[in-house]
């Protein structure tokens, strides 16, 4: 391997250097080609991987399980009811138990401190599958997707994230672009901007990489000439209806619709979303949002944009598999 990432955890977007991040992208590309050509070699035979999900998931779980299967590893899945972590057993104690049984641990939950504690005490690589602060495995897939759909070098790609920018996706897209020297636009109402903690991290990385960074409340300014527009959901299950009402009112000007796509001035602009997306009324929650708030053509993205040729969210979802596989092979592979 060109880089030695063996036994390294991935807890935040900035854990790896730009060169290491690009190495993962190249490895993911090679593994994707091998899977399509049916020439893939197993590098994880006999490895045991534990997946801890305090928050449910479709893409992250499936990507880890298929990646492990393709590479010859075994998987144990612990769902929200299948683990005592944080309830009857501390993160520290859980780490010291699982680290003796498994070669690596993935954790998806709320607390960034939790995944960091696992990594500190497990003695094996730990991967952040999502916390309230960061979504680092998603970032590898997002940059891979942007590279696949652009003929520009990574550092010349322009993208905007529009919506609630204080979210894990907002933090992560802010930081990954600054890490890799990209043209990054972060756009949302000022009250939902990333905190100073994340801005400081981004600015340090920006100075090192030469990234261009714009944080603005103006969606048209943010999307001008971009190659990609990213967004994410505005609301989450379990939140009070009052919170939904206020946030939807605040974020409605930041909906990704045809007008915003045209405002880029670039007919080749692609739409990206980590999914799931509330773009129609074919889900229980989508129907509820339409009935309660009159948003029957989608919430954070309209259905016509989501169903258009501009949408690369499903390629983005597939790339979760290839990039997570690259992470596993790079950190555990023989």
From Swiss-Prot:
It comes from the Bacteria. Pathway: Amino-acid degradation; L-arginine degradation via ADI pathway; carbamoyl phosphate from L-arginine: step 2/2. InterPro entries: Asp/Orn_carbamoyltranf_P-bd (IPR006132), Asp/Orn_carbamoylTrfase (IPR006130), Asp/Orn_carbamoylTrfase_sf (IPR036901), Asp_carbamoyltransf_Asp/Orn-bd (IPR006131), Orn/put_carbamltrans (IPR002292), OTCase_ArgI (IPR024904). It is an enzyme of class 2 (transferase). GO terms for molecular function: amino acid binding; ornithine carbamoyltransferase activity. GO terms for biological process: arginine biosynthetic process via ornithine; arginine catabolic process to ornithine; citrulline biosynthetic process. GO terms for cellular component: cytoplasm. Its EC number is 2.1.3.3. Keywords: Arginine metabolism, Cytoplasm, Transferase. Gene3D superfamilies: Aspartate/ornithine carbamoyltransferase. It catalyses: carbamoyl phosphate + L-ornithine = L-citrulline + phosphate + H(+). The keyword Amino-acid biosynthesis does not apply. SUPFAM superfamilies: Aspartate/ornithine carbamoyltransferase (SSF53671). L-ornithine binds at residues 168, 232, 236-237. Carbamoyl phosphate binds at residues 57-60, 84, 108, 135-138, 274-275, 320. It is found in: Cytoplasm. The keyword Cytoplasm applies. PANTHER family: ORNITHINE CARBAMOYLTRANSFERASE (PTHR45753:SF2), ORNITHINE CARBAMOYLTRANSFERASE, MITOCHONDRIAL (PTHR45753). Belongs to the aspartate/ornithine carbamoyltransferase superfamily. OTCase family. NCBIfam families: orni_carb_tr, PRK01713.1. Reversibly catalyzes the transfer of the carbamoyl group from carbamoyl phosphate (CP) to the N(epsilon) atom of ornithine (ORN) to produce L-citrulline. This is Ornithine carbamoyltransferase, catabolic. It comes from Rhizobium etli.
């Amino acid at each position: 391997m060109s880089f030695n990432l063996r036994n390294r955890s991935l807890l935040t977007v900035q854990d790896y250097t730009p060169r290491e991040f690009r190495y993962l992208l190249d490895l993911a590309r090679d593994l994707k080609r091998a899977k399509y050509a049916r020439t893939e070699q197993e590098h994880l035979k006999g490895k045991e991987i534990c997946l801890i999900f305090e928050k449910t998931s479709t893409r992250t779980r499936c990507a880890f399980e298929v990646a492990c299967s393709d590479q010859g590893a075994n998987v144990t899945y612990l769902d929200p009811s299948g683990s005592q972590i944080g309830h009857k057993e501390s993160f520290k104690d859980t780490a010291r138990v699982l680290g003796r049984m498994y070669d690596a641990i993935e954790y998806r939950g709320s607390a960034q401190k939790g995944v960091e504690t696992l990594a500190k005490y497990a003695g094996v690589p730990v991967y952040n599958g999502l916390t309230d602060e960061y979504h680092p495995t998603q970032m590898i897939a997002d940059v891979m997707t942007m590279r696949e759909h652009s003929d520009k070098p990574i550092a010349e790609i322009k993208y905007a994230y529009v919506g609630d920018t204080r979210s894990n996706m907002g933090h992560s897209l802010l930081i990954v672009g600054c890490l890799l020297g990209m043209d990054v636009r972060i756009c949302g109402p000022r009250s939902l901007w990333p905190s100073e903690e994340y801005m400081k991290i981004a600015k340090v990385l920006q100075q090192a990489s030469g990234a261009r960074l714009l944080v603005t409340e103006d969606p048209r300014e943010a999307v001008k000439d971009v190659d990609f527009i990213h967004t994410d959901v505005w609301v989450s299950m379990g939140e009070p209806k009052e919170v939904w009402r206020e946030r939807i009112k605040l974020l409605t000007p930041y909906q990704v619709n045809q007008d915003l796509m045209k405002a880029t001035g670039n007919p080749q602009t692609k739409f990206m979303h980590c999914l799931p997306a509330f773009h129609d009324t074919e889900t229980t929650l989508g129907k509820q949002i339409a009935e309660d708030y009159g948003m029957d053509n989608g919430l954070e993205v309209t259905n016509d944009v989501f169903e258009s040729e501009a949408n690369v969210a499903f390629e983005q979802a597939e790339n979760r598999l290839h990039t997570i596989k690259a992470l596993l092979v790079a950190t555990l592979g023989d």
